[in-house]
């Protein structure tokens, strides 16, 4: 395997618009999900995995237009997010009302296990973030 086989160019990302059940919910239906390295936590078995070689971790991504909400959810693994572009609101709690932070390009947020979290692009235009599990 060469380095080129392990390269994912941003312009070549292959999105999935139905990776999770929440993509059928109003407000979440415009989200694009990306499974970059490893199978991730997508609920759609047909989602394209850019690099499927086992790594011991997963990296995914989400691209959302302004006002698009990723519904509250939790994981059995810790998850952290790296903001690639835009400004994002992260909300915690089952209903999203336990806490809220606004983060920008280059910022990183770590979410512990079993914490309900959701996030929303709060700027005009499309924004992108990476998720590491």
Describe the function of each predicted region.
Residues 39-47, 58-75:
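Conserved short histidine dyad/triad with adjacent acidic residue
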Residues 68-71, 89, 108-109, 113-118:
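Histidine-centered metal-chelating micro-motifs
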């Amino acid at each position: 395997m060469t380095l080129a086989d392990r390269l994912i160019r941003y312009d070549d990302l292959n999105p999935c618009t139905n990776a999770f059940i929440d993509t059928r919910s109003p407000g979440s239906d415009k989200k694009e999900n990306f499974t970059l390295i490893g199978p991730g936590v997508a609920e759609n078995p047909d989602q394209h995995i850019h690099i499927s070689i086992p790594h011991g971790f997963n990296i995914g991504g989400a691209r959302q237009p302004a006002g698009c909400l990723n519904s509250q959810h939790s994981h059995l693994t810790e998850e952290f997010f790296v903001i690639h572009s835009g400004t994002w609101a992260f909300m915690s709690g089952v209903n999203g009302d336990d806490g809220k932070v606004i983060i920008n390009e280059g910022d990183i947020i770590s979410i512990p296990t079993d914490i309900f979290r959701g996030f929303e692009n709060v700027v005009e235009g499309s924004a992108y973030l990476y998720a590491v599990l």
